[in-house]
């Protein structure tokens, strides 16, 4: 076992603080509308240029083991905030640095670290409650676009395209971000439920131009087993023929005589029919079939529930306004399922998402949720170069997460103003002793740090502008982009409440751990001996 290097007390905390400052100073230059770029060197390809705080933080590993521990702990603040809120990483880093600097100073001055931590925790809890009261709902398209614009570093086109996507697929719908092939951002929207299974035979195609089978107001038969015998389907086909409607069959597989008979019936115009395989495998296939059943108002024909194909009646079939079947995809538009049943199914899937621990399962559940919620939107990011593409895609991802957070918990004035307003809620707050009161004061001063940094990055005088903003009320603040004061919400400068809350909570949590650190242990660096030179191979001088 290798020897350990141990540091105690103020020496340990100061080394850790050096690491915190190195990481935070690199990250905080990106904050605000006039934030600066950071260039990241990559082991292959060209360098990456970014204004995303978490991307900068993730690149940093320091040479000194003790300093690196401090840097990694602040990196954790950025990562956790990003995981929960999808944005606010730079704000969280700035808050953590301010809390740690003041906390370490106070411990060096003889304060009790545990009481300082209790004071910071007490102030944070009160501030979070005040933020929630200060929050305003974010439901209209304009507000969503403004949040997206701010998060994408004041790129209006990004805010607009995200608001457009949310309007088309709903706030619960799935929006994905992909690399596009052009110079401009594009939005692709797939209405209804789409799954990745196409027609089982090209003879079902009725639109030769698009090579698709289009069914208007069809019945939908769902079966969780294989269909090989046409006799099983005869009662259903007869009922559908009498109604004069089309039929889509979704089953685990349809082959042999059954598929051949369906093709012949369709080509002769006896019954307009198409067949596709059910998407997914195993239990996931059953779950998706149930989703389609709920969406179309039908039932899954299964031996498990005591239903066989021969006993199927019109009541067991689902319906939809339109179904389009391509070679590889099927889209069900406007299923006839009852809204209360669909909402119940959505709530059930949301509950499963909350409890699952597997990232893969969560991803698949989110896909199902999107399909039931009414569509999928794909934002295709356009750029001139690969370097610009990576940077732009990162910003669009951030903006998308921020808008989701805004819809979830509402918005507060941006530009660091919300945290300055929250300080007033802490004015009457006192701890159990003097040291806890110092902890509360540390938290108050730290809450000024984001606004100070935004102003500093914009080239302004932080103290003067902070005093002016502090004199104001409610949404009154400073727009660093235009260098003007006014109502932040009217100027379109908003922050999602969830982002500000998560940044403050995580910064307070990690800084509390750092302030109460009394010892640090790391491996002693090993001096690796130089490799010995190869021995002289005497007697082999004649070799060339």
Swiss-Prot record:
PROSITE patterns given in the database record: CHAPERONINS_CPN60
Low complexity bias spans: 525-537
A GO MF label: unfolded protein binding
Enzyme class per UniProt: isomerase
Predominant location: cytoplasm
Subcellular localization: Cytoplasm
Catalytic activity field: ATP + H2O + a folded polypeptide = ADP + phosphate + an unfolded polypeptide
Binding site for ATP: 30-33, 51, 87-91, 415, 479-481, 495
One Gene Ontology cellular component: cytoplasm
Self-association state and partner proteins as the record states: Forms a cylinder of 14 subunits composed of two heptameric rings stacked back-to-back. Interacts with the co-chaperonin GroES.
Main function: Together with its co-chaperonin GroES, plays an essential role in assisting protein folding. The GroEL-GroES system forms a nano-cage that allows encapsulation of the non-native substrate proteins and provides a physical environment optimized to promote and accelerate protein folding.
HAMAP family in the record: CH60
Family matches, as NCBIfam families: GroEL (TIGR02348), PRK00013.1 (NF000592), PRK12849.1 (NF009487), PRK12850.1 (NF009488), PRK12851.1 (NF009489)
Protein name listed in UniProt: Chaperonin GroEL
Origin species: Ruthia magnifica subsp. Calyptogena magnifica
Gene assigned in the entry: groEL
